[in-house]
From Swiss-Prot:
This is Aminomethyltransferase. The gene is gcvT. PANTHER family: AMINOMETHYLTRANSFERASE (PTHR43757), AMINOMETHYLTRANSFERASE, MITOCHONDRIAL (PTHR43757:SF2). It comes from Escherichia coli O6:H1 (strain CFT073 / ATCC 700928 / UPEC). It comes from the Bacteria. Its EC number is 2.1.2.10. One of its GO terms (biological process) is glycine decarboxylation via glycine cleavage system. The glycine cleavage system catalyzes the degradation of glycine. The lineage of its organism: Bacteria, Pseudomonadati, Pseudomonadota, Gammaproteobacteria, Enterobacterales. Pfam families: GCV_T, GCV_T_C.
Length: 364
């Protein structure tokens, strides 16, 4: 039977349509996915992300361990609360998961990992942590609410006490701070400003209700997906998985190649892939009628006249832009246009960078 987050009852009270999402009963929408999407782009919306897994790591060798475990380098994290995004790779350079890591002290870091990959992530982390003497604590006692949108931080701050407001004042993106019962982070999955707030399970329902009263709109998985796709953010199992290199998933920027003597899991395989070349992730835009969908073929002819085929990894109608957008994994050599096969029609698409909307505005 699917698990329920501590906010399940709040979702039903708000009229949510609930679905099984990787073993969790989660809200798909609360009546209108489109309205929820626009609320985040223009005002403030919130998502229950309590199904994600928070993992606290303690030990004197935690930084050393994470420099080995992750493709990005936690040596960059020198200020308490600073976070970075990274892939956690296998030996062949495939992506086991993408995650966020927070640095607090030399012997205390925090990971936030995906729900669908929870068990394999915990197994992998535990296996590799043992030689480093790391103490692993899975924080199932915490719920998490993402409050996103141009007015999200201001509306959320009406629930904070003076000390919490002071703690987050002027906080830059990709930071987190523990302020009383709340862990407040300037992270998100929408391309908008906002907070992701972790708090004790028993306090989550009251906090959710207070956010509703503050004018923050409950949003479901449907809006979360269209928002992240507009923002060009990857979804695990679609843009990447254990067989796909981060170099083929627009995650090259998350690989810290320097210093050259840092050994991390998957490095040798990645260096070979970088030398020989991989597929790449691009954006597609179709302004004609129709919707670009996952797994549709993408065809193009390169400058030498050779024909190639790739695949759409995520596609949708963009509520913000008013036309269809997609992310696609394609061979090298793609130009400014391509063809997508939709049923029996060949539809022309424009090839773009894999990001479409940031802070409510179209990315040119």
């Amino acid at each position: 039977m699917a698990q329920q987050t501590p906010l399940y009852e709040q979702h039903t009270l708000c009229g949510a349509r609930m679905v099984d999402f990787h073993g969790w009963m989660m809200p798909l929408h609360y009546g209108s996915q489109i309205d929820e999407h626009h609320a985040v782009r223009t005002d403030a919306g919130m998502f229950d992300v309590s199904h994600m897994t928070i993992v606290d790591l303690h030990g004197s060798r935690t930084r050393e361990f994470l420099r080995y475990l992750l493709a990005n380098d936690v040596a960059k994290l020198t200020k308490s609360g600073k976070a970075l995004y990274s892939g956690m790779l296998n030996a062949s350079g495939g992506v086991i998961d993408d995650l966020i890591v927070y640095y607090f002290t030399e012997d205390f870091f925090r990971l936030v990992v995906n729900s669908a990959t929870r068990e394999k992530d915990l197994s992998w982390i535990t296996q590799h942590a043992e030689p480093f003497g790391i103490e692993i604590t899975v924080r199932d006692d915490l719920s998490m609410i993402a409050v996103q949108g141009p007015n999200a931080q201001a509306k959320a701050a009406t629930l904070f006490n003076d000390a919490q407001r002071q703690a987050v004042e002027g906080m830059k993106p990709f930071f987190g701070v523990q302020a009383g019962d709340l862990f407040i982070a300037t992270t998100g999955y929408t391309g908008e400003a906002g907070y992701e707030i972790a708090l004790p399970n028993e306090k989550a329902a009251d906090f959710w209700r207070a956010l509703v009263e503050a004018g923050v709109k409950p949003c479901g998985l449907g809006a979360r997906d269209t928002l992240r796709l507009e923002a060009g953010m990857n979804l695990y199992s679609q843009e990447m998985d254990e067989t796909i290199s981060p170099l083929a998933a627009n995650m090259g920027w998350t690989i810290a190649w320097e210093p050259a003597d840092r050994d991390f899991i998957g490095r040798e395989a990645l260096e070979a892939q970088r030398e020989h070349g991989t597929e790449k992730l691009v954006g597609l835009v179709m302004t004609e009628k129709g919707v670009l969908r996952n797994e549709l073929p993408v065809r193009f002819t390169d400058a030498q006249g050779n024909q190639h085929e790739g695949i759409i990894t995520s596609g949708t109608f963009s509520p913000t832009l008013g036309y269809s957008i997609a992310l696609a994994r394609v061979p090298e050599g793609i130009g400014e246009t391509a063809i997508v096969q939709i049923r029996n029609r060949e539809m022309p698409v424009k090839v773009t960078k894999p990001v479409f909307v940031r802070n409510g505005k179209a990315v040119a």
